[in-house]
Amino acid sequence: MLSFFFLGVCEGWGDPHYITFDGLYYSYQGNCTYILMEEVTAKYHLKIYVDNVFCDPTEDVSCPRSLTIAYGFQVITLINHNLIGAPKLEALQNGERLKLPYSQQSIKVMSSGINLIYEIPRLNVVITFGMTGFAVNLPYKYFGNNTQGHCGTCTNNQADDCRLPTGELVGNCAVMADYWPANDIYQPNCPTPPVVPTNVPEPPLEPTPCTPDSSCDLLKSSVFAECHPLVSPENFYKGCVFDSCHLSNPIVECTSLQAYAAACAQAGICIHWRNHTKVCASDCPPDKVYKPCGPAEQATCEDNPNEQITTFVTEGCFCPDGMKLFNKESGICVEKCGCLDPEGIPREFNERFEYKCQDCICDEPTKTVICKPKTCPAPPTANCTAPGFIVVNQTSSVDPCCFVYVCKCQINTCPVNSMNCPVGYKPVVSVPEGKCCPEHTCEPKRVCVHKDVEYQAQFQSSCK
């Protein structure tokens, strides 16, 4: 008898490989948007679409580019904009990017840096999406015997997983998958399957000899040995071998390992596997650390102890041990809770600091930064008695937030001197160092003067 609390997991990864809710493995290379899961009888109004696109330049193999989740009146798309290298993940609603974490109308959307996590807390539904592909976790309590699509029927019976929209069963889920296009989405380039399905036996994974990459062997090695009794690695190994032999991008092989590690994590076994590979390294920002099993909803300074948080674990980039997020929006890790200043720098409670010529404090009662204009000491009065100097205030060289009084030369306030020099002399204007106003002096010219008349002096001659 199936447990009332049984959790069905449908997984898809690589190019892509599927494991249905009931554990049936198959591969499918469709290049359209399909119904991944829908309710046979609408009870909770949950429907999930998967958009598969060709993702290799040398082979017609496809990868899951996005999941679109329709729940009630909300439609949210989890998308990976980069299928070749490091994932570039976004959550969209009505074409607009969601600021994560998002929590509204009974759903949550979070990011671990490596995966996006979509949760419906009241139904215990958790959906993850990332470079690895996706995993849809549904409780049998709400969805048992009431699902159809690429993920199968959630009946704990693999024999009825390959069901067509008509209810007819076929023996090959890769054939079945053709019949689940998202008809309510305009897709002019999607092929129309034949009216009567043909049960073509699945071809062997590799018709010609192929040596898979050594990364695939890790799945059956001691690295994952602790998980083997709980989750079989066989389907993930088959997917890894197929990807290794068909795709030119070696990073895709990582998806099988990542998908298996995620399945192990949900079974309670955390595997540190990435450091055993050459091409599956994690990439976290400098202020975060990689963890193979961390909380999908990370602890913050703003957590309400009475509020239920997600217990789902995922790999990703997390705050170092002993630190937590300041809040859900900032993404900043702190050792002690306090305030964020206007520049986003964490401040401890009662810490005083200066910001843009304001004296600020991280106020503990309000948990906010309170600022007031900085109080400057009264500057000494400048004694400007010399001609031309006036008193002005200017920014202090010691403290740019305060001002001082200085004597500044204002030449247009200087007295006007009309100086007449005697015959044979010329007026010379200069401003002595330390003074403002020009001073006039009379200097002799190189001329001869006779009866108040100037004469040009001749070389080696004398004036008589």
Feature roles, as predicted:
Residues 1-464:
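Extracellular/secreted glycoprotein ectodomains characterized by long, lumenal stretches
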